[in-house]
Structure formats: C-alpha cells, structure tokens
UniProtKB/Swiss-Prot annotation:
Assigned EC number: 2.3.1.234
Binding site for Fe cation: 111, 115, 305
Protein family: Belongs to the KAE1 / TsaD family.
Protein name (database record): tRNA N6-adenosine threonylcarbamoyltransferase
Cofactor: Fe(2+)
Cellular localization per UniProt: Cytoplasm
Recorded coiled-coil stretches: none
CDD domains: ASKHA_NBD_TsaD_bac
Catalytic reaction equation(s): L-threonylcarbamoyladenylate + adenosine(37) in tRNA = N(6)-L-threonylcarbamoyladenosine(37) in tRNA + AMP + H(+)
Gene Ontology cellular-component terms listed: cytoplasm
Record keywords, A-Z: Acyltransferase, Cytoplasm, Iron, Metal-binding, Transferase, tRNA processing
Length: 347
C-alpha cells in the first residue's frame, strides 16, 4: 500500500510517500524559517500563503523521486490538527481534492501521533508498549503507548512547553530565530554551575511539567546582570544558556525515567523538535543505560515537522483498522485536538 502524506500544521510544508512493503519511498520538505526570521516568530497568514505556493511542487518532486504517478497512490494522509487553522486548511484542501479525484481513502492524522510514531520509521524500531516523551515548541507530554491508536496521557506541561521555553529564552538572550537551536549552540560554550536555576516540579510527585518559572528565572538574571549586549556579555550569556539547558534537561530526563519505572516500561521513545537536542539525548541515553532501558529517537531530519511521519502514521492507522480511521471527504480541521481522542478500538 502506497500512502501519500501531507504536513502543513505550522511553518514546514512536507510531502512524502510511504510504502507498507518497502518503507519510505521519497520525501520533500520546505521550511519557512528564513521567511519568519525577520519577525522573530511564525506569522500565521504568511505561513498559510507559503504552504499554498509550496505543496503542489513538493508533491510533484516526491512523485518524481519515487518514480510514481498519482494513480499509484493507494491512500492519502494529512495533518488535521493540532496547528494553525489556516495552515492546516491548505494541507487538508489538497489532500481532500486528491482523494476525491483519485477515489482513494483519506486519513486524518493527529500531528502529535505523527511525531510519536516517527521513531518506528527507523530500522531499529521499538516494540509496543513504550513510553513516549513528546517535546516540541507547542507540547511537552509523557504518553504510554500500547499500540497504534492506544495512547494514555501520563503528564503534560501546565504552562510553557519545553520548546516554547527555549524560544522565549533565546529572545531574552538576544539570540536569533529559531530560538531552540540557538540556545543549545550558545550553551555549548557555557560553564556549568555558574548560575543556579530552578528545576520546576521536579519533585511534584506526578509527571506534569512547568517551565514558565524557569523562563522567569532567566529573565531575572538577564535584568540583574544587564546581559542584553551580545558583544560584551558573551560568556555570561553562554553560562546562563548552559544553566537553562541543564535545568530543563534534568527535569525532562528524571521525570521520563521515573514514569518508565512506575509504569514498568523498558522502552522510551523521544520525539518532537526538542528531541534533537544533544544534551537531552546524552542525558537520557546515559541514565537509561544505567537502568536497563532502551531509548529510541527518529532520525534527526524527522525530529521537526515533516511529511514522512504523516504518511507513516496514516499507513499504520489504515493497517490497524481501515473502517474506523477512514475520514471521508471534508475540509474540517482541528487546531486544538487531544491525542487521546483518536483511540482505535482494537479487538
């Protein structure tokens, strides 16, 4: 079965073809980072317009790479939500039009499910059940995953997501857009232990997160030491970035390992843009190894939004239960969507 996947939830336009027999056939991605950089963040209207410009050329590129035609497509998957409403509508419109014209099944995919299942694209893939840490610009969640469509929320952020905290800290430190990678790069040159930042909710007794207080602590230090001059204050800013990354990684690592232990899970999946962070990967790998846990990640190119994860998630849903996941034709999108709402009833 050859499944076309279309991703357009925010500022990346992604298209891919996934074959349930041979794996990922082809994928293409266009990032809008350069366009949004001058505004310091994503401008929804500009994002939507750019998706319109890019999606069809990307579709043709992917078909060419795969040596396939539109007639070869067996099903079409698209991101229905969560995300920016206008951006989602672009992908939904193209997917619906293609599915209707070709008479093919249409699968609405939850964006976070795409991230959650993306490590299964790798040759060394985890078996169910596993614990998933979803860390991105808009979400920070711990999920128990028993099968495709069987997700149990164990904990989530009560305010800022981890990626959002990275982006806001980048602005406080006068770094560029996108902020997450900029903070991580600066932190590489920082000295540990110079600043003592809080570890919010580290000992809360549950698996929820909170990063707003950590961001405020960074702001306090920036104002106290007047760290706004990127030229004369380089080392103190690097030290503060290091303290921020150390704090956020410690919270993510310890809560994830605690959740795995308490739920008897030996496999951990890390997905989402923050999952590309080197410090987070090293921390989870080292501490997980001590406890006999395996930690799995998607390829770095699939940590951020992409069409491959949507094509794959759509294919997995169709295989799990075609009758229940087929979406019919319609242009509705769901900008706010709970992952637990998409459960598949397994026999």
């Amino acid at each position: 079965m050859l499944v076309l996947g279309i991703e357009s939830s925010c500022d990346e336009t992604g298209v891919a073809l996934y074959d349930t027999h041979s794996g990922l056939r082809a994928h293409a991605l266009y990032s809008q980072i350069a366009m949004h950089r001058e505004y310091g963040g994503v401008v929804p209207e500009l994002a939507s317009r750019d998706h319109i410009r890019r999606v069809i050329p990307l579709l043709e590129e992917v078909l060419g790479k795969a040596g396939a035609t539109r007639a070869d497509i067996d099903a079409i998957a698209y991101t229905k939500g969560p995300g920016l409403a206008g951006a989602l509508l672009v992908g939904a419109s193209v997917a619906n039009a293609l599915a209707f014209a070709l008479g093919k099944p249409l699968v609405a995919v939850h964006h976070l499910e795409g991230h959650l299942l993306s490590p299964l694209l790798e040759a060394d893939r985890p078996e169910f059940p596993f614990l998933a840490l979803l860390v991105s610009g808009g979400h920070t969640q711990l999920m128990r995953v028993d099968a495709v469509g069987q997700y149990t929320l164990l904990g989530e952020t009560l305010d800022d997501a981890a990626g959002e905290a990275f982006d806001k800290t980048a602005k406080l430190l006068g770094l560029g857009y996108p902020g997450g990678p900029a903070v991580s790069r600066l932190a590489e040159f920082g000295n540990p232990g110079v600043f003592d930042l809080p570890r919010p909710m580290l000992h809360s007794g549950n698996f929820d997160f909170s990063f707003a207080g950590l961001k405020t602590a960074v702001l306090t230090q920036v104002r106290k030491l007047n760290l706004t001059d990127s030229e004369t204050c380089y080392q103190p800013r690097a030290d503060l970035a290091r303290a921020f990354v150390d704090a956020i990684v410690e919270v993510l690592v310890k809560k994830t390992l605690r959740a795995a232990r308490e739920h008897g899970l030996k496999r951990i999946v890390v997905a989402g843009g923050v999952g590309a962070n080197r410090q987070l990967r090293e921390g989870l790998n080292a501490e997980g190894k001590k406890r006999g846990l395996r930690v799995y990640y998607p390829d770095l190119q699939f940590c951020t939004d992409n069409g491959a994860m949507i094509a794959f998630a759509g294919a997995m849903r169709l295989q799990a239960d075609p009758a229940q996941v087929q979406d019919g034709y319609g242009y509705g999108v769901t900008p706010r969507w709970d992952l637990e709402d998409i459960r598949i009833r397994h026999a």
